[in-house]
């Protein structure tokens, strides 16, 4: 299977997000890369499902709470930017302060 670099990046992101989700379900607190991966994957999947940029900006704020991540992670993640493919093209989705 031949993948473009962008496709490889998405595959790596989803692999990290699956691992993060499993760890969260086991009660482990997520670190910085795991939190970014999980939020990003939710945004990408939402775009695939047909949600709008505005909807995904709201969804991105409800993926994780402070209780889900290690100490200091919410302060490290001031925003998450994901380039997602929508039915009408590729758009940048920015979620400000995603971990409440």
Curated annotation (Swiss-Prot):
<dbReference type="InterPro" id="IPR036463">
    <property type="entry name" value="Urease_gamma_sf"/>
</dbReference>
<dbReference type="Pfam" id="PF00547">
    <property type="entry name" value="Urease_gamma"/>
</dbReference>
<keyword id="KW-0963">Cytoplasm</keyword>
<comment type="pathway">
    <text>Nitrogen metabolism; urea degradation; CO(2) and NH(3) from urea (urease route): step 1/1.</text>
</comment>
<comment type="subunit">
    <text>Heterotrimer of UreA (gamma), UreB (beta) and UreC (alpha) subunits. Three heterotrimers associate to form the active enzyme.</text>
</comment>
<comment type="similarity">
    <text>Belongs to the urease gamma subunit family.</text>
</comment>
<dbReference type="InterPro" id="IPR012010">
    <property type="entry name" value="Urease_gamma"/>
</dbReference>
<dbReference type="InterPro" id="IPR002026">
    <property type="entry name" value="Urease_gamma/gamma-beta_su"/>
</dbReference>
<dbReference type="GO" id="GO:0043419">
    <property type="term" value="P:urea catabolic process"/>
</dbReference>
<keyword id="KW-0378">Hydrolase</keyword>
<dbReference type="InterPro" id="IPR050069">
    <property type="entry name" value="Urease_subunit"/>
</dbReference>
<protein>
    <recommendedName>
        <fullName>Urease subunit gamma</fullName>
        <ecNumber>3.5.1.5</ecNumber>
    </recommendedName>
</protein>
<dbReference type="GO" id="GO:0009039">
    <property type="term" value="F:urease activity"/>
</dbReference>
<dbReference type="GO" id="GO:0005737">
    <property type="term" value="C:cytoplasm"/>
</dbReference>
<dbReference type="GO" id="GO:0016151">
    <property type="term" value="F:nickel cation binding"/>
</dbReference>
